[in-house]
């Protein structure tokens, strides 16, 4: 993506009316959840600071009575943190209910919550940098700074639609402009960017602008998940839009994972991003299945259509099994909500049972395959892994044999659906999602009714063993990069000049204004290029040489008019219009860099969907090693703690003799 700069003439500091956040977080359900998440984040931050101060006091004092009091207070703080973490996990683990103005009931999806951030004051560092490096009055850029701050404030509460995505990408593109104009390998803005982890609520802060860009990119992916989960997937078009949104979300997480290392928060670690990418691809695959199987138009007698649906369902089940294995392994197991892992497991069992159900429908209600169709139909099945018999035809043609095999597949479908209901009942958060239970129960009732129809009292034949279903899909979803160009807008600080010259990476000296009079051979200089116009050559002994102009200077003002954005023809026309009085020019001369950047200072910059993120640790600006900036104290609140519970609340520490500070933390905390 090429950054678009606007020439002079556009009003500085004008805020586009479409780039505005939600007026109130409480207008919609998602806004209410986001508002509550923000409150919990602030409470967690406060409790962490209290715990840090108490631990420092414990280490500093040698009075046993004071230590006992501090240890007791720490136990209360740890209990409060545990409760806050569990509440945040419930909010983060909430799933989409699956009904959006439609009579049909669909399986719920998993949307991600947005990362929260604190307000940021851009004014002081930007004004100082504009004054020191660019040689201009920083106060004259207050309108631009206010526009940037308003844009950042608005992107904290984006609407859950395309306008919200446009708002986030607009701010992301402005960060790219800021990176290109104001940052160098040896200089950062000196601001601390403070963001809360989306999964754990742990606060993290860094001075690197890359952390801000990475967090915004994460929110772009998270907003795509919310848009996808809100679609009405009971119709083909809604399923297509949902699949598109989940693919865009997977692309955002993939881009972040490939180009952002040493993440300060768990949700942006490589392991978490990989798990989120797999989850989004599995949900996109589920949308493919839903787009193929509108219940009203399905003909049970269409054997080939039923077998294709069976393979599509088996493909969805395989995707969710992969996601479940990833979520069950550390460190992802310690980050993601328990309800996510449970829902993924339920879906894996549900879609595997659905595959067997569709095969049973094909065998029992469909017509036998012809000799030419038989090889294609048999590719649906996999032989049982424990079978030692030689492989024979797996798709019988006789009516009774088809009934027996269909009955075996129905049995596996019923067992799988009952297992899905059992797993659903084990998770308290999922139990609150009645629609999920309704979907599984409805499918189970259909399977039981069909099984009762096939069952006979005089059927004493040995039950056949139903083979596994070969996963296959006609459309494999792929991660797609988010449309970072849809929010592309002009550079807010365009008045400073074109980025090719007027950036913190270059040093220059302002010359002039100098007065030029026309001689016999003109002004004695040759111009080239646009925005800004370059003095390509100066004739020795000419008027330009006498005025001190040099080859390589850039013209920034003609007769008092700023011309940094003028084209070559405009500058030439203005100079030709000068009469005997001549013209007044102001130029800048580029200076050699005082120090060439070393190899370690050369870091890529993410300017678009195919670029790279600048390293988040700016040279010479280290993030303070504060205890609340580390994600580790909160990552294992409930997992290990609940394993060691014997009932009731955590027991307060009552040390008889001074214990090391690490023993004051909740069991299972690092």
UniProtKB/Swiss-Prot annotation:
Pfam families: BRO1, HR1, PDZ. Residues 513-592 form the PDZ domain. The keyword Phosphoprotein applies. InterPro entries: BRO1_dom, BRO1_sf, HR1_rho-bd, HR1_rpt_sf, PDZ, PDZ_sf, Rhophilin-1_BRO1, RHPN1_2. SMART domains: BRO1, Hr1, PDZ. Keywords: Coiled coil, Phosphoprotein. The modification Phosphoserine is found at residue 24. Residues 652-661 have a biased composition (Pro residues). The keyword ATP-binding does not apply. Has no enzymatic activity. May serve as a target for Rho, and interact with some cytoskeletal component upon Rho binding or relay a Rho signal to other molecules. PANTHER family: RHOPHILIN (PTHR23031), RHOPHILIN-1 (PTHR23031:SF6). Binds specifically to GTP-Rho. Interacts with ROPN1. The PDZ domain mediates interaction with ROPN1. Belongs to the RHPN family. This is Rhophilin-1. The lineage of its organism: Eukaryota, Metazoa, Chordata, Craniata, Vertebrata. The gene is RHPN1.
């Amino acid at each position: 993506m090429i950054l678009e700069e606007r020439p002079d003439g556009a009003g500085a500091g004008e805020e586009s009316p479409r780039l505005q956040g939600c007026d109130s977080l409480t207008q919609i359900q998602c806004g209410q959840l986001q508002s509550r998440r923000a409150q919990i984040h602030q409470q967690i931050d406060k409790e962490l600071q209290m715990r840090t101060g108490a631990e420092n006091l414990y280490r500093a004092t040698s009075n046993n009575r004071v230590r006992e009091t501090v240890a007791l207070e720490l136990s209360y703080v740890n209990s409060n943190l545990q409760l806050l973490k569990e509440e945040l996990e419930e909010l983060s683990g909430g799933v989409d209910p699956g009904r959006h103005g439609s009579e049909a009931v669909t399986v719920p999806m998993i949307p991600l919550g947005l990362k929260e951030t604190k307000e940021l004051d851009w004014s002081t560092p930007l004004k100082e940098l504009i004054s020191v490096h660019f040689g201009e009055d920083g106060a004259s850029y207050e309108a631009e700074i206010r526009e940037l701050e308003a844009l950042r404030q608005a992107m904290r509460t984006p609407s859950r639609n395309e306008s919200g995505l446009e708002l986030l990408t607009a701010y992301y593109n402005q960060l790219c402009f800021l990176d290109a104009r104001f940052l160098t390998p040896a200089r950062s803005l000196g601001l601390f960017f403070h963001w809360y982890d989306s999964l754990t609520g742990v606060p993290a802060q860094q001075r690197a602008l890359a952390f801000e860009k990475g967090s915004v990119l994460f929110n772009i992916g998270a907003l795509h998940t919310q848009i996808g989960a809100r679609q009405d997937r009971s119709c083909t078009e809604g399923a297509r839009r949902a699949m598109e949104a989940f693919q865009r979300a997977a692309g955002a997480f993939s881009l972040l994972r490939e180009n952002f290392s040493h993440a300060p928060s768990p949700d942006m670690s490589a392991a978490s991003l990989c798990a989120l990418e797999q989850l989004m691809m599995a949900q996109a695959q589920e949308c493919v299945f839903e787009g193929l199987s509108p219940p009203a138009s399905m003909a049970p007698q269409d054997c080939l259509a039923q077998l294709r649906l069976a393979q599509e369902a088996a493909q969805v089940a395989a995707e969710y099994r992969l996601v479940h294995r990833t979520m069950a392994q550390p460190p992802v197991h310690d980050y993601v909500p328990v309800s996510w892992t449970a829902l993924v497991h339920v879906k894996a069992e549900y879609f595997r049972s659905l595959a067997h159900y569709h095969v049973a429908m094909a065998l029992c209600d469909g017509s036998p395959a012809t000799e030419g169709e038989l090889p294609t139909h048999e590719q649906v099945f996999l032989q049982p892994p424990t079978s030692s018999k030689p492989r024979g035809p797996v798709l019988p043609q006789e009516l009774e044999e088809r009934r027996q095999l269909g009955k075996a597949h129905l049995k596996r479908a019923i067992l799988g659906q009952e297992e899905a209901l059992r797993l659903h009942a084990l998770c308290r958060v999922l139990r609150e999602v009645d629609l999920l239970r309704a979907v599984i129960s409805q499918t189970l009732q259909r399977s039981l009714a069909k099984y009762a129809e096939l069952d006979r009292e005089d059927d004493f034949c040995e039950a056949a063993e139903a083979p596994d279903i070969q996963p296959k899909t006609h459309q494999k979803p792929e991660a797609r990069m988010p449309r970072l160009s849809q929010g592309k807008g002009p550079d807010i600080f365009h008045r400073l000049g074109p980025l090719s010259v007027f950036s913190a990476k270059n040093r220059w000296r302002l010359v002039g204004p100098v007065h030029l009079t026309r001689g016999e051979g003109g002004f004695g200089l040759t111009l080239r290029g646009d925005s800004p116009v370059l003095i390509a050559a100066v004739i020795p002994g000419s008027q330009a040489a006498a005025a001190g102009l040099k080859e390589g200077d850039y013209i920034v003002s003609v007769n008092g008019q700023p011309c940094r954005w003028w084209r070559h023809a405009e500058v030439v026309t203005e100079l030709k219009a000068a009469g005997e009085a001549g013209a007044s020019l102001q130029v800048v001369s580029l200076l050699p860099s005082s120090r060439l950047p070393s190899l370690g200072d050369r870091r890529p910059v993410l300017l678009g969907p195919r670029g790279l993120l600048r390293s988040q640790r700016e040279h010479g600006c280290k993030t303070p090693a504060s205890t609340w900036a580390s994600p580790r104290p909160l990552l294992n609140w409930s997992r290990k703690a609940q394993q060691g519970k014997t009932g009731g609340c955590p027991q307060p520490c009552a040390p008889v003799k001074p214990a090391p500070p690490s023993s004051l933390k909740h069991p299972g905390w690092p």
